[in-house]
UniProtKB/Swiss-Prot annotation:
ANK repeat spans: 1090-1119, 1123-1152
Residue ranges annotated for the PH domain, each copy included: 676-910
Protein name: Arf-GAP with GTPase, ANK repeat and PH domain-containing protein 2
Residues involved in GTP binding: 413-420, 457-461, 515-518
Key words of the record: ANK repeat, Cytoplasm, GTP-binding, GTPase activation, Metal-binding, Nucleotide-binding, Nucleus, Phosphoprotein, Protein transport, Repeat, Transport, Tumor suppressor, Zinc, Zinc-finger
Source organism per UniProt: Homo sapiens
Length: 1192
């Protein structure tokens, strides 16, 4: 590197020091070879000789100095930082005469690079600064000192520049030399195991390289980029210090054992330094600095080139230690080094201390810092996290926009739980085994539900406090699977958090994480999966995970799912808050309410407003004034005019949920003739199902009674003309590109009771047809005053209930109900052709460009600029989808307005569902009798426990097995299929009388005597058994029939035995024979003169339970006797309405049918008959036609 003259400059370079512990073995020193001596002489730096009287020194003064330099560099090649002048001369090396022994005391402002004090017995060498040559050193301490050098030859003309006879590079200053006498023979060397250490970061430029001050913060860990020279020198230093000057060197870093010849080949590169103080780049210290300290080298058998082979007898040339620049370090008086130097001396001495022969109190060799705990390791962890681009710790510079929401995650666990490793793996993607003893905070950007969130993670070192419990949105409890104490600590921490937060405050997402990081052969797993899941169940709303930060197992999943739970809980809280804040509509007097009947175009209109006091007349001037001022009002006034047409998008039907809602649930809007609007504004609208795809501007109003209305203009809304409405009870709202919230209602309306209008354009297309089918439709406005219908209306509105159900799905093209349109529903082929027509290009699609232009023009008027028109990603649409699949598209002017509309509609949908009474609850006229029936089922013999696992209080039932099961076994029974087990809930489903009779007649005791007669020594699962054990038992019991009771020894066919059992009304025997009949077809031919089947006989006996069992197990419901009569004839002849209803529900033809019915049609049961009006389809749901077994 060029060392030309230049201004005073300082270069600060951060170096990484690689510390390596090497294995030392005692070997005899090799004899110095001429080639080694020559190589060492070629690589040394030239300088003035310290012994001019010596012949060898006079001839080759540089070679002696080079050899000595190599000897000292093998000991240590580290120096502190210093500033120098570019044109300063290099230090001169001269022999240092002996001086009386006295301690070395650095001058003020001087840093002494004393790195280590070798352990072992006192050495005879000493340090003695003596300006006079000839003194003999007597001190017993020998520090490791070196002069920075490249090891190459010195350019000519650079020697000198100092005081004659001195090695100081500073002119005009005195010289102090430190000389080291040869030490006594080293003690017996010990053998140590070679171990690579960790890296440590150096301090900043002007500070000491030996340590860092407390005010400089934690060190930053960077990549390992140790150069060959530095690594070799440090390894050599380690070798020399550990050996104490004796023994040979065996370094794993390389570069030292090569000898002086290898060093001679090294050449300095531009801008690269091999010393910590850049002294090789800036050799000259500033003027006025103290003289350097010099000391003679000590011969060691570990060096490749010894002084004995290169020098004649005489005083050895000393090695000069350059003092640092003044003012860079505060000095210490009284012979003490600086605090940081002493700390680093202690640190390096502890590393290089031998296990034997060391001073008392020296501990064993420390392991790698990454596997130990301590403040240094914690600082390394913090530095690594700060250096990572994925994590930001306590950073005030890395911020996001205020519009980005924050998710606050707290992490709790004890010191051995592995929570720090979990967080570290999530933030940086790397593994760190250390645990923090202090609370820390982290930040990371995360994508949840397609939206960016800033996740704030707080790692709590101790127990949570009140501030933490109020701050966190979610808490992750972490424990180690191999540590019982950490598992117990989680339970204790959860109790403390619950007491601080209280039961009243909800919305806290919890997660329990078991870490597998420390599990090994020596520390096995002690916390089982069952215990962990039991604790998770006790925490409520908690999810359990097992992670491994070493390999990253489930680490990202934990934080992602916890963040998802927080977002979901927030949405639910916002929805509930919006529902609670719904305004209550005031009650108005009905005296001024004009109730108007509606009709389609050309239909009959009945106006009953004349029977009530009419509203006051409004003049044209007042009308114009009101119309002009309505734009500034939040709710435009309602003008009470004559009856105006407002088409309902849903066909009004008798018995629908919308008509069953009470007046108070509709908003109690009986005074003004119009419901109170909750939200209203202009929106763009287009229908999703009509042919017209153009966007149209509509004035949309959301009413408090659960209806959404839209009109072409605000004037039409004021006059209640040309408007359409939709009942939000049967709809849902969606936003394109967003995942809908997981809001599940307790009960919802049926999807088969709604008829919808396509669009206004479709209504206009069907006007001619509507004119020929007049039908009055009730007013959409709720009122207690219903208009009395005329005779025609009475005739049309009082059809048979079954006929009304059959006609409920048939609509005219406009969507209105018509009693004359009885066309059957379209076949799949017709639907396919209809879809094909819709997918073909039409003329209306050609006008898409014109519609887009209109929409952009409206945006231009709304925004007032062209800024957002050509941005394709700006889409402010939301969709309203009905239960039948019809879609309405609306578009707002901004994201805020769209979100406000969506939130208001969702709140109104939820309010409508909560206020609507279910039809199932309405039809329960005798709930007390049903409760008595369910209690009778529970009182049956053996029904107090589960039939399969013995769990108490089962709440589910298997109908065709006649047994009660628990909720865990019910899921397995559902997987078996309805041909094996028909599952129904005791609490959630209806229980008609025929099903109640089956459950009370059989019971768990009878069922187990049939299906579980001989277990063959197999253990029955208990209530604590796993799902796999339960499933294996249930399938063996009901699917494979392994435990089925054997038949009697009678040789009669099964058909005759079944006939006899039915005739004897033996339910248990019938159930057993039906179970055995599953192995093959059942021969039901008996010697009956009337050719009756067991089903005929059961119907004749009016036995409901046997009739139901025969039908469930595949009896031929259409079988006829010799006179062509079905079982329905015998049931009615016996007067059993329950048996008749069961047969009708399973598709039994009437008793007057022809006997020539085809067997194929007869053997396929289908639900085609209309049940009696007094009974709903109770068993039709369990008597499905997809049962694959036809046994009878």
């Amino acid at each position: 590197m060029s060392r030309g003259a230049g201004a005073l400059q300082r270069r600060t370079t951060t170096y990484l020091i690689s510390l390596t512990l090497v294995k030392l073995e005692s070997v005899p020193p090799p004899p110095p070879s001429p080639s080694a001596a020559a190589a060492g002489a070629a690589g040394a730096r030239g300088s003035e000789t310290g012994d001019p009287g010596s012949p060898r020194g006079a001839e080759e003064p540089g070679k002696k100095r080079h050899e000595r330099l190599f000897h000292r560099q093998d000991a240590l090649w580290i120096s502190t930082s210093s500033a120098g002048t570019g044109g300063a001369e290099p230090p001169a090396l001269s022999p240092a005469p002996a001086s009386p022994a006295r301690p070395v005391s650095p001058a003020p402002g001087r840093r002494l690079s004393l790195w280590a004090v070798p352990p072992g017995p006192p050495l005879s060498g000493g340090l003695s600064p003596d300006p006079k040559p000839g003194g003999a050193p007597t001190s017993s301490r020998r520090p490791l000192l070196s002069s920075p050098s490249w090891g190459g030859p010195e350019p000519e003309g650079r020697a000198g520049g100092g005081i004659p006879g001195s090695s100081s590079p500073h002119p005009g200053t005195g010289s102090r030399r430190l000389k080291v006498a040869p030490p006594p023979p080293a003690p017996k060397p010990c053998k140590t195991v070679t171990t690579s250490g960790a890296k440590a970061g150096g301090g900043k430029g002007a500070g000491s390289r030996l340590s860092w001050p407390e005010s400089e913060g934690k060190p930053r860990v960077k990549g390992s980029k140790s150069s060959a020279g530095t690594g070799a020198s440090v390894s050599a230093a380690a070798t020399a210090a550990a050996a104490g000057g004796g023994g040979s060197t065996a370094s794993t870093s390389g570069g030292v054992g090569a000898g002086a010849g290898a060093r001679g080949k090294l050449s300095p590169r531009k801008g690269k330094s091999k010393t910590l103080d850049n002294s090789d780049l800036h050799p000259g210290p500033p003027a006025g600095s103290p003289p350097p300290l010099t000391l003679p080298p000590t011969p060691s058998p570990a060096t490749a080139v010894t002084a004995a082979s290169a020098q004649p007898p005489g005083p050895a040339p000393p090695i000069t230690l350059e003092p640092p620049a003044p003012g860079l370090k505060r000095g210490r008086e009284g012979g003490r080094a600086s605090t940081r130097d002493r700390k680093m001396l202690k640190f390096i001495s502890g590393i290089f201390t031998k296990s034997t022969g060391g001073p008392p109190g020296s501990g064993p060799l420390p392991g790698p810092p990454s596997l130990s705990s301590g403040s240094g390791s914690r600082e390394l962890l913090g530095a690594e996290l700060r250096a990572s681009p994925k994590a930001v710790i306590n950073s005030q510079e890395w911020t996001l926009s205020r519009s980005i929401p924050e998710l606050r995650l707290g992490v709790l666990g004890d010191a051995r739980s592995g929570k720090s490793s979990l967080i570290h793996r999530f933030l940086t993607g790397s593994y760190q085994v250390l645990e923090k003893t202090e609370s820390e905070q982290y930040k990371k950007e995360m994508l949840v539900d397609g939206q960016t969130h800033l996740v704030l993670i707080r790692e709590e070192a101790g127990a949570p406090d009140a501030k933490f419990s109020g701050w966190a949105d979610a808490v992750i409890f972490v424990f180690s699977l191999e540590d019982e104490n950490s598992f117990q600590a989680v339970s204790r921490l959860h109790g403390q958090l619950s007491s601080l937060r209280g039961e009243g405050r909800g919305g806290l997402a919890l997660a329990l994480v078991g870490t597998q990081d420390r599990i090994s052969a020596s520390s096995p797993r002690v916390v089982g999966d069952a215990r962990a899941r039991a604790l998770c169940a006790d925490m409520k709303r908690c999810s359990y995970y097992e992670t491994c930060a070493t390999y990253g197992l489930n680490v990202d999943r934990v934080f992602q799912e916890v963040a998802q739970k927080v977002v979901t809980l927030r949405k639910q809280q916002q929805l509930l808050a919006a529902c609670k804040s719904l305004p209550s509509s005031p009650s108005h007097s009905a005296a001024s309410t004009p109730v108007a009947g509606q009709a389609s175009n050309g239909g009959h209109t009945s106006d009953y407003s004349s029977s009530l006091p009419s509203s006051p007349n409004v003049g044209h001037r007042e009308l114009r004034a009101e119309a002009a001022a309505v734009a500034g009002l939040s709710t435009p006034g309602s003008l009470h005019r004559a009856a105006k047409r407002r088409t309902s998008l849903f066909a009004n039907r008798r018995g629908s949920d919308s008509e069953k809602r009470s007046l108070d649930s509709r908003g109690e809007t009986t005074g003004s003739g119009r419901a109170i609007p909750i939200k209203q504004s202009f929106l763009l609208k287009r229908s999703g199902n009509s042919l017209n795809k153009e966007w149209k501007k509509k004035y949309v109003t959301l009413s408090s009674n659960g209806f959404l209305l839209y009109h072409p203009s605000i004037n039409d809304y004021i006059h209640s003309t040309h408007g359409k409405e939709m009942d939000l009870l049967r709809t849902t709202v969606k936003v394109p590109g967003k995942r809908p919230p997981r809001a599940i209602s307790a009960f919802g309306p049926s999807a088969s009771i709604n008829g919808l209008v396509k669009d206004m354009s479709t209504v206009q297309m069907g006007e001619g047809l509507e004119a020929t089918t007049p039908m009055p439709s009730p007013s959409p406005s709720p009122s207690s005053l219903q208009p009395p219908p005329d005779q025609t209306s009475k005739h049309l509105l009082k059809p048979d209930r079954n006929l009304a159900r059959a006609l409920s799905t048939d609509c005219t093209p406009s969507g209105d109900l018509s009693p004359l349109s009885r066309e059957p529903p379209p076949s799949p082929m017709v639907k396919k052709q209809r879809r094909k027509k819709l997918t073909t290009p039409s003329k209306t699609e050609g006008s898409a460009g014109q519609a887009e232009a209109k929409r952009k023009m409206w945006k231009l008027k709304s925004f007032g600029s062209l800024r957002n028109i050509y941005k394709a990603e700006e889409n402010f649409e939301f969709l309203i989808v009905s239960s039948t699949g019809q879609t309405w598209h609306f578009e707002a002017a901004s994201f805020e307005e769209r979100d406000a509309w969506v939130q208001a509609i969702e709140s109104q949908i939820l309010a409508s569902l909560q206020c609507c009474e279910s039809s199932k609850v309405k039809l329960r006229t005798d709930s007390q009798s049903e409760a008595v029936a369910i209690q009778a089922i529970r009182n049956a013999k053996g029904n107090s426990i589960c039939v399969d696992c013995g769990a108490p209080n089962p709440t589910w039932a298997s109908l065709n097995l006649g047994a009660l099961i628990c909720i865990e076994c019910s899921g397995i029974h559902r997987n078996l299929g309805t041909h094996l087990s028909r599952v129904r809930s005791l609490d959630l489903d209806d229980w008609p009388r025929e099903l109640t009779l089956v459950l009370t007649a059989i019971g768990n005791d009878t069922a187990n005597r049939v299906w579980e007669s001989d277990t063959r020594g197999r253990a029955k699962p208990s209530r604590d058994s796993s799902r796999e054990e339960r499933e294996s038992w249930i399938r063996a019991k009901y699917e494979q029939l392994l435990f089925l009771a054997p038949l009697s020894t009678s040789e009669e066919p099964l058909g005759r035995q079944l006939w006899a059992a039915v005739q004897a009304q033996d339910v248990a025997t019938v159930l057993l024979l039906l179970a055995h009949a599953r192995h093959g077809p059942l021969d039901t031919s008996v010697e009956d003169p009337q050719l009756r089947s067991p089903l005929h006989l059961a119907a004749e006996l009016a036995h409901v339970v046997i009739t139901q069992l025969l039908l469930w197990y595949g009896a031929d419901v259409a079988a006829r006797d010799a006179q062509g009569r079905t079982a329905l004839f015998y049931a009615r002849q016996a007067g059993s309405q329950l048996c008749a209803d069961i047969l009708l529900q399973h598709g039994c033809p009437g008793e007057g049918g022809s006997a020539a019915t085809t067997p194929s049609a007869a053997t396929t049961p289908s639900i085609t008959a209309t049940p009696s009006p007094r009974r709903r389809s109770s068993a039709a749901s369990v008597g499905r036609a997809d049962a694959p077994v036809a046994l009878v």
